[in-house]
């Protein structure tokens, strides 16, 4: 369903007295479908944050019954200090839903499901794998920020008909050690067909962002994190039944581990609940 169809459907549906939630991506849509009462809430999924924002800007000009809420991934925008959101549009707590789940009380459940342990892991073992995964995804997030600041247009995503960015080019599959900034930079430059960018200039940008001492949860992007996890599962860290998981299967595991009770501890939930209470609309299960 394209954004014009969604906009017209919401604008013309005078019988709907509940809430419409517009999200980007299938994972976000499925998560909110699991948490909401379908009689009181309609979930609309669009492909990009730009489409969510465009829809919310258009709907803000239309008088209608019911209430519409947009939810977009932060995608490092608050850290970059850019973009004012339209009315009734909220950011995720961290850069996206996946990193919200990763930095929540759901992670121990995810770790026990995905990773191989000789015995039930204690808190220190859970924290160790959490820290390792965050550190490996962090360097990619840092390079994303440098790229945004410089305007190089590097590619980190998997496009149609395009091969994946190979994380094993800068992360050692055998022990998950980091091969260094040059390996990361070369992998992303090659993936982006931007070999002319100077590595020393990129490394200066990485040094600057690291001196700023941001929290990892401000920098790490869910797409990178789930790719790192999928790579980790392919060596001794993974269980036999999860060793062949790809990024999409890891994301499903994240969603299944994230309960409504855990979601209620998030700032996003508090923001949604506050807005809905103001309008006298209850929509969660």
What are these regions (language model features)?
Residues 1-285:
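Acidic, divalent-metal-binding catalytic cores of TOPRIM
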């Amino acid at each position: 369903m394209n954004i014009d169809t969604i906009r017209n459907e919401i604008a013309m549906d005078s019988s709907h007295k509940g809430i419409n939630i517009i999200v980007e991506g299938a994972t976000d849509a499925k998560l909110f479908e699991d948490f909401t009462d379908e009689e009181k809430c309609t979930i609309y999924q669009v492909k990009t944050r730009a489409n969510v924002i465009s829809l919310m800007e258009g709907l803000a000009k239309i008088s209608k019954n019911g209430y519409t809420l947009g939810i977009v991934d932060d995608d490092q925008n608050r850290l970059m200090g850019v973009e004012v959101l339209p009315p009734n549009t909220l950011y995720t707590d961290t850069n996206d839903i996946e990193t919200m789940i990763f930095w929540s009380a759901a992670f121990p459940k995810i770790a026990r499901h995905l990773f191989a342990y000789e015995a039930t892991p204690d808190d220190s073992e859970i924290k160790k794998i959490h820290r390792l995964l965050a550190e490996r995804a962090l360097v990619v997030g840092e390079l994303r920020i440098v790229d945004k600041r410089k305007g190089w247009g590097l590619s980190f995503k998997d496009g149609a008909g395009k091969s994946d960015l190979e994380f094993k080019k800068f992360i050692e599959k055998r022990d998950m050690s980091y091969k260094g900034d040059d390996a990361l930079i070369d992998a992303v430059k090659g993936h982006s067909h931007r070999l002319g960018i100077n590595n020393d200039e990129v490394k200066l940008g990485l040094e600057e962002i690291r001196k700023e001492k941001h929290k990892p949860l401000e920098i790490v992007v869910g797409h990178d994190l789930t790719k790192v996890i999928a790579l980790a599962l392919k060596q001794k860290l993974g269980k036999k039944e999860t060793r062949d998981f790809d990024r999409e299967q890891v994301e499903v595991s994240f969603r299944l581990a994230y309960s409504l009770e855990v979601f209620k501890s998030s700032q996003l939930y508090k923001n949604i609940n506050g807005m809905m209470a103001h309008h006298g609309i209850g929509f969660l299960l």
